[in-house]
Amino acid sequence: HSSNRRQRQMCIRDSFIKALYATFVTYLPKEEFSYDLISHQDDRGIFVEFLKSKLFGQVSFLTSNPGVTRGEHFHNTKLEKFLVIKGEARFKFRSLDNNEKFEIYTNHKKLQVVESIPGWAHDITNVGESEMIVLLWANEIFDEKKPDTFSHEV
């Protein structure tokens, strides 16, 4: 249904379903060739969920203003992969097991993927002088009823 498209959930798990979906979208009216996304905006920047699938997880992006830190949480099962596509970032990590800490600095010139691992609290800080834009993949869709995101000092 087009309502699933608006919820940004995709289910293309095999070649038959892929072909069926491709056929379905060829019948969409022109008015449904595009749709708006919801932007969650505050003084830190914006966060936008782009694609969701129970099979491949979720793709989102965020922006952060200079000096802003986002995150400061951990997950039990959620894996995340971050790619800075504009700006400079510092990722901080703290092990929940032994309090070990470390940092990773990266920027858009490196094209380096930084992963958050379950059991490690993490945050990301814009250490540059301009807006930072980060592409984010998570292995599971955010579920407001079971968020698997727990605030924790890094």
Place the predicted regions along the sequence by residue:
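Short beta-strand His + acidic residue motifs that chelate non-heme Fe in jelly-roll/DSBH
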Residues: 47, 71-73, 91-93, 114-116, ...
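Single conserved hydrophobic/aromatic residue that forms the stacking wall/gate
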Residues: 1-12
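Glycine- and acidic-residue-biased ligand/ion/polar-headgroup-sensing regions
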Residues: 77-95
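Short acidic-glycine-tyrosine-enriched beta hairpin
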Residues: 96-118
